[in-house]
């Protein structure tokens, strides 16, 4: 069992929130952008038609253009995360709820720490082995995206 302790909060995230965010970061760390963006749709309360989904995906690809090529010293992971949340909320009807923000905030703290200590690191891709370890030890269900083909 993994227990995360954030200096600012002890909380529980509902399965659809933790699963969607886990899958998002897992796919992102493996440079599978399409699957990462699809995973965030597990937070959507809207049913997206194909056009809305295409618009959402296009905006996400714009946000993450060259993302995997740059280190934390070359880009602000915190700003990218805020753009991601905004796009998911505005274009896909995602509802993160207050339970998601300790997870996001912890990554922002990590981003700040890495910028100061190891600015050449590609933070998200370096998370991949640890996410594989989580997957091996935790039952993480697949998020169910809501959109119409």
Predicted regions and their residues:
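Conserved catalytic cores of large enzyme domains
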Residues: 1-149
């Amino acid at each position: 069992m993994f227990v995360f302790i954030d200096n600012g909060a002890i909380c529980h995230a509902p399965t659809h929130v933790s699963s969607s965010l886990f899958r998002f970061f897992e796919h992102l760390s493996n440079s599978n952008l399409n699957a990462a963006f699809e995973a965030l749709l597990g937070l959507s309360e809207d049913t997206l038609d194909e056009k809305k989904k295409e618009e959402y995906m296009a905006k996400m690809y714009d946000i993450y253009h060259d993302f995997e090529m740059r280190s934390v010293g070359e880009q602000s992971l915190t700003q990218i995360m805020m753009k991601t949340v905004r796009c998911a909320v505005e274009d896909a009807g995602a509802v993160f709820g207050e339970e998601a923000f300790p997870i996001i905030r912890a990554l922002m703290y990590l981003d700040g720490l890495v910028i100061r200590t190891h600015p050449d690191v590609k933070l998200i891709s370096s998370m991949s082995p640890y996410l594989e370890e989580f997957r091996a030890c935790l039952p993480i269900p697949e998020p169910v995206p809501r959109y119409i083909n």
